From Swiss-Prot:
GO terms for cellular component: endoplasmic reticulum; lipid droplet. Pathway: Secondary metabolite biosynthesis. The keyword GTP-binding does not apply. The active site is at residues 148, 152. It holds the Pfam family adh_short. Keywords: NADP, Oxidoreductase. GO terms for biological process: phosphatidic acid biosynthetic process; secondary metabolite biosynthetic process; triglyceride catabolic process. This is Short-chain dehydrogenase PC-15. Its EC number is 1.1.1.-. Signal peptide: none annotated. It comes from the Eukaryota.
Amino acid sequence: MERRTVLITGCSQGGIGSALAEVFHQRGFHVFATARKTEKMKHLRDLDRMTLIPLDVTQESQISAAVELIQKHTGGTLDYLVNNAGDGYIIPVLDCDQLHGRQIFEVNFWGPLRMIQEFSPLLIAARGTIVNINSVASETLPLWLGIYSSSKAALLALSETLRLELKPFGVQVLSVMTGAVQTMIFQTNYRLPPDSAYMTWEKQIAAQAEGSEKASRMSATVYAERVVGDILNRQGGITYRGQMASFAYWVVALMPRFLRATPLLAQVGSQ
């Protein structure tokens, strides 16, 4: 029996991708772990069945090189593609730097699309599965995350369309709506632009950006174990994992949008 294969983007130490790589490895997979810089994956280097690949999902040449490498290794198949690499951006929409905002979409939306397009022949050959790591923010639309939430909402729409378009080829598409998870992606010394109209709320926004707000978070390892279980046992669709993810599901499913906005408005008041 041939060993199953998985490619995971964004596997820098301390993040979700790294935890996913370790859990897949424990399940007996050959893991192709990627990050912009391989030194950020040195904790994975000595594991057998673990191939580290330098990959920036915004660079088509690096994606093409990864396709060629994996084709040679597997004979032209890939069982699972996990699009995990992503960037956050906590900023009031009025203060958004548009170049930075476009870069968020390059990583969070166009990056996964590039990966899917380039690896589709390998996935179709294996009748494989595409997994897009998304966020409950794409549905709950929290304050100060307008650009990030928009990029993830676009990814969700793309995933649901792909789920239908790829079904004739036997390829499954799974979206993982992620709640709060303990990672190392937070910013430090957060500051709003000096002319921001939101200076009254800078301390509150900074706490969110720096991860110092009093919110409970699921460990990345527990999250990864549950997500890998979903990946191996589901036939595509949408799953919710991470702290408060199930709560977010029920809020979106049962609560009218105008009621969902009420607690958000309470955070900023009205003028």
